[in-house]
């Protein structure tokens, strides 16, 4: 990974104070963490540094407390979840700067792990304020960023600290960037991208960037309806951003000029109601009834996607093909996910996927572990796919 240092470059950390930025923005219900995936992702970096004798000081944000302390957004309950995942004692300090932080850090010995309170309890965090960044840096000798999911934000703990202390990429960021490099940076071709989800409006930058970089773009979900409408196909009562038809047309023109094939549904599963047990029918795409909604792509469309996956060396996936959260409209997404997973297991495909709905869909299909890489980074993954610079990553590149 050219351009920045990883933990492999960090030779002697015994007794050093390592400020480690992690993503602990996990779901909590009634004071209990309900999903520890993000903690599990950063556990290898925490334990590696601890095992090497570093004083590991965890920096993280949680929720949106608007720059002031808020008991609802305290990281204290999360410290217990981190302890459970690591199977190690995790100390807690009631502030990330000032006397409480200094006292807790001063009491540490090599190998100890300390979680500091929510960085967003201070307005200086999101403003990337130099004074606040200095106050954070006062408790560290080395900075390691392992929060790729926050790398698209130029905040004090994700970007500012990298300018004040020797900066390194943690194992999560390293794995993420290496996977993304394989996916779009320097991929094996042909590259197929699957982009789904409800709205074109949220993914214009993404689609515009992808048509210049991939060989085939499969468009699914509600956003496919806008492209179908732009082509003059009636989509009945389906979710459709009719005001973006010209944008969709331009993306199709750009794709043609770049030599990128665009694959739209050729058939669809439609229903009059979006509810469990609704009566459905499968129709050709130019025969959608006026009173029906497209809620999934049909079997002919799935076969078309599979044909492209047979030719592809690389797959980048963001967004489901249909309304997968409600059966039977999950069928196309599940089938394509399982097919891509099989091709990956057979070493015929490099598969990189990301985005909340995509991760949920792959978990539903029980194939997350079969993909080459599944990003939990959300907004950062999307901005990377859009071709944008990520401040938290750029700050590590020296």
From Swiss-Prot:
First-level EC class: transferase
Catalytic activities: (2R)-3-phosphoglycerate + ATP = (2R)-3-phospho-glyceroyl phosphate + ADP
Any single GO CC term annotated in Swiss-Prot or TrEMBL for this entry: cytosol
Chain positions recorded as ATP binding sites: 203, 325, 355-358
Keyword ATP-binding in annotation: yes
Coarse class of the protein's main subcellular location: cytoplasm
Pathway of action: Carbohydrate degradation; glycolysis; pyruvate from D-glyceraldehyde 3-phosphate: step 2/5
Molecular function in Gene Ontology: ADP binding; ATP binding; phosphoglycerate kinase activity
Ligand binding (substrate): 23-25, 38, 61-64, 120, 153
Keyword terms: ATP-binding, Cytoplasm, Glycolysis, Kinase, Nucleotide-binding, Transferase
Keyword RNA-binding appears in the UniProt entry: no
A GO BP annotation: gluconeogenesis
SUPFAM superfamilies membership: Phosphoglycerate kinase
Superkingdom assignment: Bacteria
Coiled coil: none
Subcellular location as annotated: Cytoplasm
InterPro entries to which the protein is assigned, alphabetical: Phosphoglycerate_kinase (IPR001576), Phosphoglycerate_kinase_CS (IPR015911), Phosphoglycerate_kinase_N (IPR015824), Phosphoglycerate_kinase_sf (IPR036043)
Catalytic activity, EC: 2.7.2.3
Family: Belongs to the phosphoglycerate kinase family.
Subunit structure: Monomer.
Name of the protein this chain belongs to: Phosphoglycerate kinase
